[in-house]
Every structure is written in structure tokens, then in C-alpha cells.
């Protein structure tokens, strides 16, 4: 500030005393005149001093006004800045809310796109299923066509044979003509079928075209949706970039305002320091001017030091700015390099994606080019936003890659469809060729007929026929004419059919041409895409050039900024020098003024200055406090805004991480889908192998069935006595040949069975039980056993449903590997051929079980005899709802050596709970064998009673034989089985044979018993050593049955009959066994009323000398305890109903056969 220069100070004026004379010796008379002059001078001086004081006060007032104006301006600037801060905060909050809303909209768009992807995947799956169905139908039709071809060839051969026979016999010509007519009718019917099949193929082709069109429409809609979503994304990116630009501009404004505030603070501090210095100087100048000068000098020194510090600070700031500029340049260069790499990667990805895109993406490419150009224009302003925008573009490109892969798959499916159409065309051409062959054959037939006609004419000329023969010949010729006319009609129809086939061929050729046109169209589109690739490469080069130009521009800008900073530094130094000079001038002026004014009115000025100082200090303190408060408020608000921005940035980063995680999850889901597809393909292959194995087994079943039919026809009548063994076989042998059940080919018929849980069970059961036992089922219809209920099957199915599909396939493959034909047919065949061969019990699952359980496995031995020829057939039928029967049969005959051996079926009636546990270990479809009684069986027993009479009653009373009754409960089973080893001169090998295709592994844990002398543990060979009494063994087995679980096996003791006289080889080692062995009655014991059924074994043998159950065999001890002994513990719980049910079916059958 400039102040006007006042007058120079003239020094202090002291008034002269009244007595002092000023003239040095003047007279007294001159004294009044001197006083007047002194007063006038004094008044003038006082007036001058007053003027000077007024002048100085005016100067002070002017300075005061100026300071107040400056304070008002600063206050206004602060208020304006506060308002601007509030507005910017409100705008920032609005921008954040809009950003959140757009993020929500983006998420919704992503969800919609995910739904579209899932819908497309579902559509692809449906298309593949339809393709599989079409393949399956085509394979079926191919097999039908092949069968038709075979039948047509056979018939053709028959027609040729008949035509050759017509030359020899004219009488048979009519028959052959009629047969030819029938064959032609069949050919016409087959041709009609072929026409229907052609129509069906055409309809299917049209339906396929419609589906393809629908798919194309859906893909077009999907592309439109994609375009819309891409446009939305680009709009959102633009808005985000605008907001980020605004935020950057606001940050720059904040920085500028902070710098201005700092400068204002520095100015205020400087002014405060100067004011304090002035006040101190004024207080000290009043006391000592010299001290003021020294203080001024010290202040000058301090100012110099401060100037030095300021210079040092400015140098540090300039160095920092240079370092910061270098860092910024380096970071900018690194970012540019990373951006270049990202652009390169993006361009490569875009090239890969554009290779698979179609013409429909041209509009998208144009829009993308425009968007990229706009984004490039914004890159110069938004260098910090490039990373985020690039990540979003990469995500979008990944989506495009997935969609392009889907389109590739769809194109592959279209190619497969084209291949199928070509195959169908070839098939139709083959059919047309076959029709032409048929036409040629008909023409050859016509030629043969004409030749026959000529031969007949020659014979007429050669032979002189009678009138009757002539009439017959005329009739024959008329018939031949009719047949010729019919052949002509048929040939015309065949020509029409050939024309239709030609028309169809033309249609197919037209369709093929359309497909060729489509291919050319696709090739053109590929060329367009290549051109677009070239354009993109050019665009990439242009972008690189632009980036280089921008880098140069940025370098120029940075240089200009450095120059501006240097100029600013110079201007600051000049301003500091100017202010220093002004301060020096002010000090000089103040010194002069103070030297003038303070010497005159020291005390007045002191009082006034003290008051003024106090008031000014108060005002300054108040203003300083207000300024400090405002600055603190502004700083706090700026900190809060920075914290809010940081928190929002962190939220955005977290959301980006979540999106990346979702991408990874989608990739994992796709990989899982691919693995599932591979597993499904493997399952399909395994099912095809199973279907082939089932076909082979069906052929084996047919062979075995034919062998059985041959055996039954050979041995329908007994060789010795001529008695008919199998009654009703003639009625059942061929009547129900159409009812023979084959194993179901459910796996072959449909790869997607509606009930896959029961697949392994059905395949296992049907493989072993379907085809071979049809005749045995017919034989078993004579006995009319009651079928099993469906509850057993439901329990089995519930146990199997919990298994996986892969496990059931493995089990089915294991059952294929373990398959062996059942030994019943070998037993029957060998028994009739009088060969003693022990049959195998079945295929065990483990070799160790075969080694450990040889003693417990039951063997069957068949032997022939002369005494009596009898067949003991014990059959059990189990119906499981699908009319699948399981029959247990045993065939008994008499050995040539005169020994009877009974093949004893063991009926397994274990509780269902235990069977379910066993099925969970071995999940193979096994049918249960059960015996139940129906009214038909009771009627048979009543008939037997009427015939036999008293003998039957005696057999009912005799209940102590070799039969065993076993009661089983749910918690434990009473093992009351005793294994009969050897009687005196007979050994019985019994084997449980289940003809339901099931070879069960039976484990029998027998209690440890002491062996009697001459007794053998295992029935492996024939022995003639007599057994001692085994009553002790039975008692021990009764004691051991409480802690062991066994299945009952009772072996009947074979005895010699009346064949001793006829065959002396047997000797007289044993007597005929009692009728206990023949009329043995198995009993059913129930531990809990009707809950469970124990296993029942029937021992039945027939001898010739049957007198009494006690007197006939005095030497033979019973090998097994009687049913009454074992059932003594359970008689209290049995009811009358259980006693009625416990009658022996074997006895009824024996009584039936004796009738």
C-alpha cells in the first residue's frame, strides 16, 4: 500500500521562559512586543502540528477502510466456495445414486442373458433327443426293410421252383399260378407299405424343416436381444465415462480451490505477522528509536532468512513437481503399453469371434466400430477409465465366444442332418432299384408264361386232343389270358410307382440344389467376414498411429506445463522482491513520521494507540477465530467427501470381483455339462452293448427251447412200461407257441427308459428266465399253483431304486460276464440217457466262497432204475405282474443199477427283510421261489383221496420221516436242519435247482458234530459203507440250531426195490426203505403268526415195497428230525389256518401221479 509522504520533522520546540530575553540585553520596554510574536509563532506551530495530526489520522482511517474491504471480500469468497462445495456434494451424491441404479439395470440384463443361454441349452438338448429318436426309428425301419428283402428273396426262389415244376405237370400249374397271385398281392401290400413309409419320411422331413425354421427365428430374436443389450451397455459406458469426467473436473477444481485457500492462509498469516511487528515497533519506538532500528535490522534479517527458507521450499516443491511429473510420465507410458497389449489381445479375440459370426453381425460390427471410435475419442480425456472399460469389453467378448461356439454346434447339427438326408436319399434310391428288380422279375415271369403258352400250343399240334381235353385246354388258355392281363395291370401300376419314385428323386435333387445354394451363400458370408477382418486390421493400424500422435501431444502438453510452472516461479520471486522493497519503503516512511509525531504528542498518542490496539486486537482475534472455524469446516467436509469416494470405489471393486466369480462359476457349470454329456454317451454305448448281448442270448434261448422240445418228443412215452409221462404236452407244445416270452429289449427299444431304476433288475431277471422256460411254464399250468403277490416285487424294486444308474449298468455287465446256461436241461437230458453226471449248482460270485462252502452247496444226482418209472415234478410259479414265471422242477427216474435218487427242490421262503439285505449286497434281478396253495390243488387232492382211500390216511398219520420244518422270524431264524449223510447202501445228492434264471449261493453253517465211524462228511463219491445210528447227531444239531442260521436240506435215503432179482449187482446190503421216504410230508412252522415263512424242503421218493412207515425199514434210522420234534417249541403259536396250510404239496403231487 502506498501512503503520501508528510512533511519533514523540524525538531522539538520548547517555549522560552517569561523572564528570559531573547535579544541578549534588550530594554524592558520591548518585552510585550516579543511576547506577541512568540504566541503567534506558537499558535502557528500548533496549527501546523494539528494539521499534521489530522493528516496522519486520515491516512490511518483510509488504511482501516481498505483492510475492512479486504476482509469483506475474503468473507464473500469463503461463502461462495462453501456454496460451491455443497452443490458439488449434491451433484456427486446424485451421480452415485444414478450409478447404483444403472448397476442394478446391468445386473438385470445379465440375468436375462443367462436365462437366454439356459433356454438355448434346453433347445439344443431337445434337438439332440429328437435326432436320437429319428435315428432309432430309421434303424427299426432298416431292419424291417431287410426282413422284407429276405422274405422276398425266399418267395422268389419258391416261385422259380414252382415254374420249373409247371413244365412237368400241367395240373400243378393252377396251384403255382394261385401262389404267384398271392405273392403278387403280398408284393403290392408291401409296396403300399413302402409308399406309406415314404410319405412318413416326407412328413418327417417337412417337420424337420419347420423345426429348423423355428430355430432360425428364435436365433434371430436372440440376436436382436443381444444387439439391444449391447446398445444398452454402450449407453451405460458412455454415461459412466461422462460422470467420471465430471468427477475428475471436480477433483481438479477442488485442488485449485485448496491451493487458493492455502495462498489466502499464507497471506493472512503474513498480514498478521506484519501487524504484530508494527504494533511491537510502535510500542518500542515510543521508548527507544535506536532499539527500533536494531529491531528493524533484526526483522530484515528474519525476512531474509524467511526468504531463504521460502526459496528452499520452492526449490523442494519444484524438485518434487519434477519427480512427480517424471513418475506420471512413466506411469502414463506403462499404462499406454499395457493398453496397447490389451488392445492387441482384444483385437485377436475379436478376430477369432468374427471368424464364426454370420452376416447378421454386420450391423453389430458397424455399431461396434462407431462405439470404439467414440471411445477412442474419449480415451484422450479418460486415460484412467480404460482398464475398467477393457475388462467389460473382454467379458462381452467372452459371451460372444460362447455364443459363437453354440452357433458352431448348431451348424454341426445341421451338417449331421444333411448327412442323414443324404443317407435317406440313398435308401430311397436302393428301394427304387429293388422295385425295378421286381419289375424285371415280373417281366421274366411273363416271358416264362409266354414260353409255357408256346409249349402248350406245340403240344396241341403234336398231340391230337379229344374234345374234352380241348375244352380244358381252352379254359386253361382263358385263364392264362386273364393272368396275362393281370400281369399287365400290375406292370402298369409298377411303372406308375417308378414314375412317382422319379418325381420324388427330382424333389430330393431340388432340395439338394437348395442346400448347395445355402452353402454358396455361407461361403459368400465367410468372404465378407474376411473382408471385415482386413478392415479391422487397417483400423488397428490407424488406432496405433492415433495413439502415437496422442502421446506426442501429451509430451508437448507436459512440456508446456513445465514452462508455465517455471514462469510462475519467476513471477513469485519477483512478487516477493517487490513486497520486500515496499516493506522497506514503508519502514522508512514510518520512521520519519514517528520521529515527527511521537516527539510532539507522546502521551496522547499512547492513550489513543492503546485503545485502538485493544479494539483492533479484539477484532482481529474474532476474525481469525471465524476464519479458523471456516477452514476447519471446509477441511472436514473435504475429508468426508474423499472417504465417501474411496468407499464407493471399494464397493465397485467388490462388485467386479463378484462378477468375476460368477464367470468362473459359469465356466465350471459348462465343464460339468460337458462331463455329463460324455457320461451319457458312455451309458448309451454300454446300453447298445447290452442290447447286442441280449440278442445273442435270445438266439441261445431259442436253441435251448428247440432242444427241450426234441427231448420231450423223444421221451413222451416211457420206454419200459409205455405210460404217458407228460400229459397235456401235445395240447401245450405248439398251441401257445405265440405266447412264448422272450427277454424284453427295453434297453434296445428306448435309450431313455421311463423307469431307469429297475433297468438292471429287469435285465438280470429276463436274461436268465425268459426264453428257455416257456414249455416248462406250459407244463406247470397243469398243476395251477397260485401266483406270487406283487408285494415281493415292490420290496425288491424299492431296494434297487436307491442305486445309481452307473452301478446298475456295472451290475448288468457283471451279470453278462457271469452268465451260464442253467443245468436243468442237462439234467433232464442225461437222466433220460441213463448217464450219471452231477450238475453244477450255478455260477458263484467269488472263488473263495466256492472253496469254503463246498460242503454246504447242494448237489443233484440223477439215476435210472427198473423198478418203477416215475416223474416227480415240484413246480413253483411266481407271477410278478409281467407274467414272468419261475419253475423249479426235478425229474426222478430209476437208474440201471436199481437205485432211486430223488432230485429235491429246496424252496426258499426266507423273510423278506433278510432277502432285501441280501439283494442290497447282490443287486441282480432274482426271482423268488415260493409255494402257495390254491383251490385247484385242493380239488386234485380230493380226487386223489377218492382213488386211494385208506392208504392216503395211513400216509397222513405217518408224520415222522425225513421232512424238516423250519420256522423263521424277522429277528432270527431257527436252524433246525440236520444233514443226512449216508444210509447203509445208498447216497443221495440233492441240489436246489431254481429254473428262474437265478443261481443262488447258499451258505449253510452246520454245527460241529462228531462223525460216526464209517460216516463220510462230504457227499462227493459213491460209497457202500453203512452208517451207524445217528440219533446222537440229531440231538446235537437240535442244541446247535439256536446259535446258527441254516437252510434246511433233507436227503432221502435210497433203497433197493424189487429189482434185486433182476439185477444181482446191487447185492443184499440194505432193505427196502419204508414209506416214510415216499410219503414224506413237509411241514410249515410259523414262529410269528403269518409274519415270515421259513425255508421248506420236500423229500419224496417212491419205492415198490411200501407196507408201513415203521415195519418196512427196521434197520434205517431217520436222518432228519421229524417236523413234530422241531415244531414242538412253536405249536402254541400256530392256529388252525396254519395247520391247514402246512400240508405237503409234494404228497399231493405224489397222490396225483399214483392215480
From Swiss-Prot:
Sequence segments annotated as region (Disordered): 1-36, 293-315, 910-934, 953-1155
Compositional bias of kind Acidic residues: 1128-1137
Basic residues: bias regions: 916-934, 1035-1044
Protein localization: Nucleus matrix; Nucleus lamina
Compositionally biased tracts (Polar residues): 11-21
Family the entry assigns: Belongs to the CRWN family.
Protein's recorded name: Nuclear matrix constituent protein 1a
Source organism: Oryza sativa subsp. japonica
Gene that encodes it: NMCP1A
Amino acid at each position: 500500500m502506498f501512503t503520501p509522504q508528510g512533511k519533514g520533522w523540524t525538531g522539538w520546540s520548547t517555549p522560552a521562559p517569561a523572564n528570559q530575553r531573547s535579544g541578549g540585553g534588550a530594554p524592558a520596554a520591548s518585552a510585550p512586543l516579543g511576547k506577541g510574536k512568540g504566541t503567534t509563532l506558537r499558535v502557528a506551530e500548533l496549527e501546523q502540528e494539528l494539521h499534521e495530526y489530522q493528516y496522519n489520522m486520515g491516512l490511518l482511517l483510509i488504511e482501516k477502510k481498505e483492510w475492512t474491504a479486504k476482509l469483506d471480500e475474503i468473507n464473500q469468497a469463503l461463502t461462495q466456495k462453501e456454496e460451491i462445495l455443497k452443490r458439488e456434494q449434491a451433484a456427486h451424491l446424485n451421480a452415485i445414486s444414478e450409478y447404483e441404479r444403472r448397476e442394478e439395470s446391468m445386473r438385470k440384463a445379465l440375468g436375462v442373458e443367462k436365462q437366454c443361454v439356459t433356454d438355448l441349452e434346453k433347445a439344443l438338448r431337445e434337438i439332440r433327443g429328437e435326432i436320437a429318436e429319428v435315428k432309432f426309428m430309421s434303424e427299426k425301419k432298416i431292419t424291417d426293410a431287410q426282413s422284407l428283402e429276405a422274405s422276398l428273396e425266399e418267395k422268389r426262389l419258391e416261385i422259380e421252383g414252382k415254374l420249373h415244376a409247371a413244365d412237368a405237370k400241367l395240373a400243378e400249374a393252377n396251384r403255382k399260378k394261385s401262389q404267384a397271385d398271392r405273392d403278387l398281392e403280398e408284393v403290392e401290400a408291401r409296396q403300399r407299405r413302402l409308399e406309406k413309409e415314404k410319405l412318413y419320411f416326407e412328413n418327417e422331413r417337412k417337420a424337420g424343416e419347420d423345426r429348423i425354421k423355428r430355430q432360425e427365428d428364435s436365433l434371430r430374436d436372440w440376436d436382436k436381444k443381444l444387439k439391444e443389450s449391447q446398445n444398452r451397455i454402450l449407453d451405460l459406458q458412455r454415461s459412466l465415462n461422462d460422470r467420471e469426467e465430471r468427477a475428475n473436473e471436480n477433483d481438479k477444481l477442488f485442488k485449485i480451490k485448496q491451493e487458493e485457500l492455502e495462498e489466502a492462509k499464507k497471506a493472512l498469516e503474513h498480514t498478521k505477522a506484519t501487524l504484530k511487528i508494527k504494533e511491537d515497533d510502535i510500542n518500542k519506538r515510543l521508548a527507544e528509536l535506536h532499539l527500533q532500528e536494531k529491531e528493524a535490522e533484526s526483522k530484515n534479517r528474519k525476512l531474509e532468512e524467511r526468504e531463504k527458507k521460502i526459496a528452499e521450499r520452492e526449490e523442494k516443491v519444484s524438485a518434487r513437481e519434477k519427480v512427480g511429473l517424471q513418475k506420471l510420465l512413466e506411469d502414463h507410458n506403462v499404462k499406454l503399453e499395457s493398453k496397447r497389449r490389451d488392445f492387441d489381445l482384444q483385437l485377436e479375440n475379436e478376430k477369432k469371434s468374427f471368424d464364426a459370426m454370420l452376416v447378421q453381425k454386420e450391423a453389430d460390427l458397424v455399431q461396434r466400430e462407431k462405439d470404439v471410435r467414440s471411445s477412442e475419442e474419449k480415451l484422450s480425456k479418460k486415460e484412467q477409465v480404460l482398464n475398467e472399460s477393457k475388462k467389460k469389453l473382454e467379458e462381452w467378448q467372452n459371451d460372444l465366444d460362447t455364443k459363437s461356439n453354440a452357433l458352431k454346434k448348431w451348424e454341426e447339427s445341421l451338417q449331421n442332418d444333411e448327412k442323414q438326408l443324404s443317407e435317406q436319399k440313398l435308401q430311397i434310391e436302393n428301394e427304387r432299384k429293388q422295385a425295378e428288380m421286381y419289375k424285371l422279375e415280373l417281366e421274366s415271369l411273363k416271358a416264362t408264361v409266354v414260353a409255357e403258352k408256346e409249349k402248350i400250343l406245340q403240344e396241341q399240334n403234336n398231340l391230337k386232343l379229344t374234345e374234352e381235353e380241348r375244352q380244358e385246354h381252352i379254359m386253361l388258355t382263358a385263364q392264362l389270358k386273364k393272368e396275362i392281363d393281370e400281369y399287365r395291370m400290375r406292370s402298369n401300376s409298377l411303372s406308375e410307382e417308378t414314375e412317382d419314385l422319379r418325381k420324388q428323386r427330382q424333389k430330393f435333387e431340388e432340395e439338394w440344389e437348395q442346400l448347395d445354394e445355402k452353402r454358396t451363400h455361407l461361403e459368400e458370408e465367410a468372404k465378407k467376414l474376411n473382408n471385415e477382418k482386413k478392415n479391422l486390421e487397417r483400423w488397428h493400424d490407424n488406432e496405433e498411429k492415433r495413439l502415437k500422435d496422442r502421446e506426442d501431444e501429451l509430451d508437448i502438453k507436459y512440456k508446456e506445463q513445465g514452462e508455465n510452472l517455471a514462469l510462475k516461479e519467476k513471477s513469485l520471486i519477483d512478487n516477493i522482491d517487490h513486497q520486500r522493497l515496499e516493506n522497506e519503503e514503508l519502514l522508512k516512511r514510518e520512521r520519519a513520521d514517528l520521529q515527527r509525531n511521537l516527539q510532539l504528542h507522546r502521551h496522547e498518542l499512547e492513550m489513543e494507540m492503546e485503545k485502538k490496539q485493544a479494539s483492533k486486537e479484539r477484532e482481529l482475534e474474532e476474525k481469525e477465530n471465524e476464519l479458523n472455524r471456516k477452514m476447519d469446516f471446509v477441511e472436514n467436509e473435504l475429508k468426508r467427501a474423499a472417504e465417501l469416494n474411496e468407499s464407493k470405489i471399494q464397493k465397485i471393486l467388490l462388485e467386479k470381483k463378484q462378477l468375476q466369480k460368477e464367470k468362473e462359476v459359469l465356466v465350471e457349470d459348462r465343464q460339468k455339462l460337458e462331463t455329463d454329456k460324455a457320461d451319457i454317451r458312455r451309458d448309451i454305448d454300454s446300453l447298445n452293448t447290452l442290447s447286442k448281448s441280449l440278442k445273442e442270448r435270445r438266439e441261445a434261448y431259442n436253441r435251448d427251447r428247440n432242444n427241450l422240445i426234441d427231448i420231450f418228443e423223444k421221451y413222451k412215452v416211457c420206454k419200459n412200461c409205455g405210460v404217458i409221462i407228460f400229459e397235456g404236452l401235445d395240447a401245450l407244445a405248439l398251441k401257445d407257441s405265440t405266447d412264448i416270452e422272450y427277454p424284453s429289449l427295453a434297453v434296445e427299444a428306448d435309450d431313455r427308459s421311463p423307469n431307469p431304476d429297475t433297468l438292471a433288475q429287469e435285465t438280470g431277471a429276463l436274461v436268465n428266465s425268459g426264453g428257455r422256460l416257456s414249455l416248462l411254464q406250459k407244463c406247470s399250468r397243469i398243476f395251477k399253483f397260485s401266483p406270487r403277490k406283487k408285494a415281493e416285487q415292490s420290496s425288491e424294486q424299492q431296494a434297487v431304486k436307491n442305486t445309481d444308474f452307473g452301478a446298475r449298468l456295472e451290475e448288468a455287465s457283471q451279470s453278462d460276464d457271469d452268465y451260464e446256461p442253467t443245468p436243468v436241461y442237462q439234467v433232464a437230458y442225461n437222466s433220460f440217457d441213463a448217464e450219471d453226471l452231477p450238475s453244477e449248482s450255478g455260477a458263484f460270485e467269488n472263488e473263495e466262497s466256492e472253496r469254503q462252502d463246498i460242503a454246504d452247496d447242494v448237489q443233484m444226482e440223477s439215476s435210472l432204475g427198473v423198478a418203477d418209472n416215475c416223474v416227480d415234478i415240484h413246480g413253483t410259479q411266481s407271477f410278478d405282474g409281467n407274467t414272468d414265471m419261475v419253475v423249479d422242477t426235478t425229474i426222478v427216474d430209476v437208474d440201471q443199477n436199481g437205485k432211486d435218487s430223488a432230485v429235491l427242490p429246496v424252496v426258499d421262503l426266507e423273510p423278506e427283510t433278510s432277502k432285501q439285505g441280501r439283494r442290497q449286497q447282490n443287486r441282480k434281478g432274482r426271482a423268488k421261489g415260493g409255494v402257495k396253495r390254491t383251490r385247484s390243488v385242493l380239488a386234485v387232492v380230493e380226487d386223489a383221496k377218492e382213488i386211494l382211500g385208506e392208504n392216503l390216511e395211513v400216509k397222513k398219520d405217518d408224520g415222522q420221516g425225513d421232512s424238516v420244518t423250519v420256522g423263521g422270524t424277522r429277528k432270527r431264524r431257527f436252524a433246525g436242519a440236520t444233514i443226512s449223510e449216508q444210509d447203509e447202501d445208498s447216497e443221495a445228492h440233492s441240489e436246489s435247482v431254481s429254473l428262474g434264471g437265478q443261481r443262488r449261493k447258499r451258505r449253510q453253517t452246520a454245527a460241529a458234530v462228531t462223525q460216526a465211524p464209517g460216516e463220510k462228511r462230504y457227499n462227493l463219491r459213491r460209497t457202500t459203507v453203512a452208517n451207524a445210528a445217528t440219533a446222537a447227531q440229531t440231538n446235537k444239531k437240535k442244541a446247535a440250531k439256536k446259535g446258527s442260521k441254516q437252510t434246511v436240506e433233507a436227503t432221502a435215503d435210497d433203497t433197493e426195490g424189487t429189482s434185486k432179482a433182476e439185477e444181482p449187482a446191487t447185492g443184499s446190503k440194505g432193505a427196502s426203505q419204508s414209506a416214510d421216504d415216499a410219503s414224506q410230508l413237509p411241514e410249515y412252522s410259523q414262529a410269528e403268526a403269518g409274519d415270515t415263512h421259513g425255508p421248506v424242503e420236500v423229500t419224496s421218493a417212491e419205492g415198490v415195497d411200501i407196507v408201513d412207515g415203521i415195519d418196512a425199514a427196521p434197520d434205517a434210522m431217520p436222518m432228519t428230525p421229524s417236523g413234530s420234534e422241531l415244531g414242538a417249541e412253536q405249536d402254541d403259536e400256530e392256529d388252525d389256518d396254519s395247520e391247514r396250510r402246512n400240508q405237503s404239496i409234494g404228497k399231493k403231487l405224489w397222490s396225483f401221479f399214483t392215480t
